[in-house]
């Protein structure tokens, strides 16, 4: 049974609350753009592609409800303004993720174009928006499978030759980039899924991904769900793993929240360190991201705003109480793991320089550096 993180049917949306994973499966209904803003900001849903999809669909659900109740304005311009204001509001929930901003901009242009038509009603503008949002959901799953296939083929060609394991490769990934971070299948984790399906995966390794533990809570959950051979490591074990030749790690594959025009990549904190380790150990380092994550308006990583999260996300940890062997898991509790009064710096992302990246996997192929040693990402939009 496939893992479903975003459940949508016309007029209804619910999300798998990722704050409770892996111990509890709870779906939260989303009725409005306001609901989506809080779900995204609180990280009940996360992952750049997923939050863009949830943002888009939340407004589709809100518009559908207004239509059904007869509360939507008949004036096309009024509905256009309503939609654009809601999109701007949702986009403020997670500023680093370019997919969210890109989706808001793209959907805004669609409703502006529709509202300019002669004799167009407010309902027709809303229905045009709903169709566009639903198509985003459909396209995301298709794009993720493309990323998985292209990435797996590249790794099989480029990385397996130098890895031990008789035609198979071990892959290390960071944070969560699977079905829980997208509309389905995943980006970097989609590459691992495709390698596994092709019988070319020796083993998958996932980092714990402190301080929010997306690796141990979410990626490990997906790997176990899909019966993919995998091992969890702490973030600080990555160097030792790459030095351990018998592990056969031939590639590190990560996702992205924003890729600048020159290839500099903002991703979960700790990604930059993994790229440095990969370069030192001669391991391929790949970024897996749809074209919607590439921001051609941002020239380099210096122009990417880095979100900082609350100190409590580093100094506290939440999970179920562990009882005796027969008792299983108890009630959820929050405990502190840091000295009271210590200062905290908690950036959610870091920026990996393009010079450390071997390839950027998109839904239309893998982009490598040209002879000049630079990525020319404008070509993926031609």
UniProtKB/Swiss-Prot annotation:
Its EC number is 5.3.1.23. It is found in: Cytoplasm; Nucleus. The keyword Disulfide bond does not apply. One of its GO terms (cellular component) is nucleus. Keywords: Amino-acid biosynthesis, Cytoplasm, Isomerase, Methionine biosynthesis, Nucleus. It comes from the Eukaryota. It catalyses: 5-(methylsulfanyl)-alpha-D-ribose 1-phosphate = 5-(methylsulfanyl)-D-ribulose 1-phosphate. The active site is at residue 257. Belongs to the eIF-2B alpha/beta/delta subunits family. MtnA subfamily. NCBIfam families: eIF-2B_rel (TIGR00524), PRK05720.1 (NF004326), salvage_mtnA (TIGR00512). This is Methylthioribose-1-phosphate isomerase. It comes from Paracoccidioides brasiliensis (strain Pb18). The gene is MRI1.
């Amino acid at each position: 049974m496939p893992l479903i993180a975003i459940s949508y049917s016309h007029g209804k949306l619910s999300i798998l609350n990722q704050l409770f994973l892996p111990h509890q499966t709870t779906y939260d209904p989303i009725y409005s753009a306001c609901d989506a803003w809080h779900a995204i900001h609180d990280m009940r849903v996360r992952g750049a592609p997923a939050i863009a999809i949830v943002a888009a669909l939340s407004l589709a659900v809100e518009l559908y409800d207004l239509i059904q109740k007869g509360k939507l304005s008949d004036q096309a311009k009024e509905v256009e303004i309503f939609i654009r204001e809601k999109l701007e509001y949702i986009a403020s929930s997670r500023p680093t993720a370019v997919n969210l901003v890109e989706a808001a901009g793209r959907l805004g242009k669609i409703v502006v174009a529709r509202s300019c038509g002669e004799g167009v009603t407010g309902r027709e503008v809303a229905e045009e928006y709903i169709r566009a949002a639903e198509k985003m959901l459909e396209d995301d799953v298709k794009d993720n499978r493309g990323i998985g296939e292209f990435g797996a083929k590249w790794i099989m060609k480029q990385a397996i030759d130098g890895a031990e394991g008789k035609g198979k490769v071990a892959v290390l990934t960071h944070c969560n980039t699977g079905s829980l971070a997208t509309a389905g299948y995943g980006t970097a984790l989609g590459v691992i899924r495709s390698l596994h399906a092709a019988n070319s995966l020796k083993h998958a390794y996932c980092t714990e991904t402190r301080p929010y533990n997306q690796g141990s809570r979410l990626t490990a959950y997906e790997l176990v769900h899909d019966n993919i051979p995998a091992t969890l490591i702490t973030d600080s074990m990555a160097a030792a793993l790459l030095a351990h030749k018998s592990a056969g790690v031939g590639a590190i594959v990560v996702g992205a929240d924003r890729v600048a025009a020159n290839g500099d990549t903002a991703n979960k904190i700790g990604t930059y360190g993994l790229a440095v380790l990969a370069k030192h150990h001669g391991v391929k380092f790949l970024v897996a991201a749809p074209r919607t994550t590439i921001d051609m308006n941002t020239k380099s990583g210096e122009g990417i705003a880095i979100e900082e999260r609350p100190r409590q996300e580093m100094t506290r940890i939440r999970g179920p109480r562990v009882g005796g062997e027969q008792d299983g898991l108890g009630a959820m509790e929050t405990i502190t793991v840091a000295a009271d009064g210590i200062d905290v710096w908690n950036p959610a992302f870091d920026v990996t320089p393009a010079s450390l990246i071997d390839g950027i996997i998109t839904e239309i192929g893998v982009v490598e550096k040209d002879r000049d040693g630079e990525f020319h990402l404008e070509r993926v939009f031609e």
